[in-house]
């Protein structure tokens, strides 16, 4: 158990979680390597007083995904006292560039006690002509459910999650074409997928 920096009341809070009086709701904001050699920082050394980070867009979990490596714990990973089944992902078939989209994810609490789940939505553009991460976090929502209960998480994906920076135009742009929408528990656990078509507009 890693409580980060919980403050002066951290002991009581941690005890409540360990004894099952409270549901742990935190999710990892980083990726933890299974072996140190998989961490890019181990290959970064200053040269002549200059320190270059050459991962570009492929930082953190994006790098693990790009190189098909499995870390010890993915970005977004977290534990709880119940289990969940991801049942259905609903997305609009089409969205206009600049509009964003609303994603709905149906999940079922399959455990024996009430719980809280952080439903995460990622985007991917495998057919893109641009250098893109394998997938990136676009939004999330927390839901609570009793044992056996099915609930729907509604995640609003903002328009900026679909944009990229155009170096040539010095502006944010939205690439038209198919976009994969994935939903799951972490960057490496996304059991549901769907596709939305991004159509161009004059301003995007």
Locations of the language-model features?
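Generic structural detector for well-ordered beta-strands
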Residues: 85, 90, 106, 139-146, ...
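Short coil/turn motifs at secondary-structure junctions
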Residues: 110-112, 126-128, 160, 186-188
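Intrinsic-disorder/low-complexity, polar/charged segments enriched in Ser/Thr/Lys/Arg/Asp/Glu/Gln
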Residues: 100-102, 150-154, 191-193
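Intrinsically disordered, low-complexity Pro/Gly/Ser/Thr-rich segments with frequent PxxP/GP/PP motifs
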Residues: 129-167
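Secreted, periplasmic, or luminal enzymes acting at the cell surface/secretory milieu
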Residues: 1-116, 122, 176, 180-184, ...
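Terminal connector regions
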Residues: 158-204
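Short acidic, flexible loop segments centered on an aromatic residue
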Residues: 112-129, 135-137
């Amino acid at each position: 158990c890693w409580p980060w920096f919980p403050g002066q009341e951290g002991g009581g809070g941690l005890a409540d979680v360990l004894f099952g009086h409270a549901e742990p709701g935190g999710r990892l904001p980083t990726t933890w390597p299974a072996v140190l050699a998989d961490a890019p920082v181990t290959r970064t050394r200053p040269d002549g007083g200059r320190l270059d980070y050459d991962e570009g867009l492929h930082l953190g979990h994006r790098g693990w995904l790009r190189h098909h490596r499995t870390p010890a714990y993915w970005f977004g990973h977290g534990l709880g006292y119940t289990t969940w089944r991801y049942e259905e992902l609903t997305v609009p078939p089409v969205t206009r560039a600049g509009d964003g989209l609303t994603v709905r994810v149906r999940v079922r609490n399959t455990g024996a006690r009430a719980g809280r789940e952080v439903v995460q939505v990622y985007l991917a553009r495998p057919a893109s002509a641009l250098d893109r991460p394998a997938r990136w976090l676009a939004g999330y929502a927390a839901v609570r459910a009793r044992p056996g209960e099915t609930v729907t998480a509604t995640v609003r994906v903002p328009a900026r999650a679909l944009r990229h920076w155009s170096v040539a135009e010095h502006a944010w742009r939205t690439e038209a074409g198919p976009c994969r929408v994935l939903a799951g528990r972490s960057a490496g656990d996304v059991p549901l997928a769907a596709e939305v078509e991004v159509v161009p507009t004059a301003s995007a």
